[in-house]
């Protein structure tokens, strides 16, 4: 199991902040170039492969065409001379990040459901695990030694060794760091990030450890239904217990922020024409800060929701969580579900569930809101409005979200539904 903890960089040891900041900014520029170029090459290879398949009846072998077994190798060969300041291992990790992301979303890109990934200015710097080490000094400071530069860049910048930095370690971060130093946790690929709003640099240390094992029953399943009025509804088949997370705070926050954003845009639109240049930048900055506020609220809320969900699954002894596959979320017809990042919430649930030893299964949600969780009858008329479910066949009546969550908690429910509607 891999987790991440963020440590603030206090200062570099062998450089002043101006020198260190210059190095990090230059590496950010090269990282951005590498990510975008690798994505471009992956896109071009996908297009070439598709045309080749149409003309020859089979996909090309990258070794024959590119001279490398995969796009990652070809991209590294193409990019390394232009992103020459980056440590070779870190550059390889950066290119892998771009090609892996492109591959993960290739189908969505082809369908037109999402645009080709692009990377902006303040992006993380990658560090492979071999290029980061941490130690505690006799006076108590924690030092992280980082291999950031290639040999030519070291000569160019007059840096003779690894760059060492003092990091702030306290609270839960101290426990994690002490376990890393004791060998209980292992450092894995990490990142350096910049918080533009605070103008601070952080070291995101990833660490690997064996998750605690709990006695959980795989046959006990929690079903999760995602909605609007109730953001998350949790139900089970082995117990009448139910839990829910109201969606009101999310919707209220979204409306407030959207209203504020529109107001800011109008103010910028009608501002005097003479207020150009830096004046425009000043007007845009609050809008950018609003975006940060939205992102922070989303991240915090989804962390809180996912923790509660997994905790309730453990409480009920569930070894399995089943939830909706939201790949085609737009087909659901809810604009709210599109606005709120349910994908991010699901990723956090999966992450925390796996950490607890819980299996996560995604199911096709079609008809789960129309099916009676008591008798299995499927009828669009069973759903009376947004909140009430009443079965036309057996008369079972319940909260509509609870009924859907109970259906989702049934093993192989999507297959059962597919058979029943044939």
Swiss-Prot record:
Cofactor: Mg(2+); Zn(2+)
EC number(s) recorded for this UniProt protein: 3.1.-.-
InterPro entries (UniProt xref): Cas12f1-like_TNB, RNA-guided_DNA_endo/Transpos
Any GO molecular function: DNA binding
Manner of cofactor binding, per the entry note: Mg(2+) is required for dsDNA cleavage.
Broadest EC class assigned to this enzyme: hydrolase
Chain intervals for the UniProt region annotation (Linker): 212-220
Residues engaged in binding Zn(2+): 372, 375, 391, 394
Tagged with keyword Metal-binding: yes
Catalytic residues in the record: 225, 324, 401
Function: CRISPR (clustered regularly interspaced short palindromic repeat), is an adaptive immune system that provides protection against mobile genetic elements (viruses, transposable elements and conjugative plasmids). CRISPR clusters contain sequences complementary to antecedent mobile elements and target invading nucleic acids. CRISPR clusters are transcribed and processed into CRISPR RNA (crRNA), which requires a trans-encoded small RNA (tracrRNA), but not this protein.
NCBIfam families, A to Z: guided_TnpB, IS200/IS605 family accessory protein TnpB-like domain
Record's subunit section: An asymmetric homodimer. Guide RNA is probably required for dimerization.
Similarity field: Belongs to the CRISPR-associated endonuclease Cas12f family.
The protein's name in its UniProt record: CRISPR-associated endodeoxyribonuclease Cas12f1
Protein species of origin: Sulfoacidibacillus thermotolerans (Acidibacillus sulfuroxidans)
């Amino acid at each position: 199991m891999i987790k991440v903890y963020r440590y603030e960089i206090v200062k570099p040891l062998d450089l002043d902040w101006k020198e260190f900041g210059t190095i990090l900014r230059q590496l950010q520029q090269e990282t951005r170039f590498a990510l975008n170029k690798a994505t471009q090459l992956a896109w071009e290879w996908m297009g070439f492969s598709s045309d080749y398949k149409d003309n020859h009846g089979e996909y090309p072998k990258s070794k024959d065409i590119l001279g490398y077994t995969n796009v990652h190798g070809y991209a590294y060969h193409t990019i390394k001379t232009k992103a020459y300041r980056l440590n070779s291992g870190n550059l390889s990790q950066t290119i892998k990040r771009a090609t892996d992301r492109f591959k993960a979303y290739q189908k969505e890109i082809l369908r037109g459901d999402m645009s080709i990934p692009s990377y902006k200015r303040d992006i993380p710097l990658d560090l492979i695990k071999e290029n980061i080490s941490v130690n505690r000094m006799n006076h108590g400071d924690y030092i992280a030694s980082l291999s950031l530069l290639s040999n030519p860049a070291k000569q160019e910048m007059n840096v003779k060794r690894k760059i060492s930095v003092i990091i702030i370690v306290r609270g839960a971060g101290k426990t994690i760091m002490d376990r890393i130093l004791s060998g209980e946790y292992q450092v894995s690929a990490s990142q350096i990030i910049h918080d533009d709003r605070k103008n601070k640099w952080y070291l995101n240390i990833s660490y690997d450890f064996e998750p605690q094992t709990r006695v959980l029953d795989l046959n006990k399943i929690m079903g999760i239904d995602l909605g609007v009025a109730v953001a998350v509804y949790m139900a089970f088949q082995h117990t009448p217990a139910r839990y829910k997370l109201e969606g009101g705070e999310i919707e209220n926050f979204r409306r407030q922020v959207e209203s504020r954003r529109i107001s800011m845009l109008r103010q910028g639109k009608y501002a005097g024409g003479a207020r150009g240049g830096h004046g425009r930048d000043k007007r845009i900055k609050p809008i950018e800060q609003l975006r940060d506020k939205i992102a922070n609220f989303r991240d915090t809320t989804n962390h809180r929701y996912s923790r509660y969900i997994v905790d309730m699954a453990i409480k009920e002894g569930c070894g399995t969580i089943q939830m909706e596959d939201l790949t085609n979320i737009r087909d659901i017809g809810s604009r709210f579900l599109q606005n709120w990042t349910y994908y991010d919430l699901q990723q956090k649930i999966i992450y925390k569930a796996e950490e607890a030893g819980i299996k996560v299964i995604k199911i096709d949600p079609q008809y789960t809101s129309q099916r009676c969780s008591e008798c299995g009858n499927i009828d669009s008329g069973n759903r009376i409005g947004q909140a009430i479910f009443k079965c036309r066949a057996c008369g079972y009546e319940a909260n509509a979200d609870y009924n859907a969550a109970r259906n989702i908690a049934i093993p192989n429910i999507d297959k059962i539904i597919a058979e029943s509607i044939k």
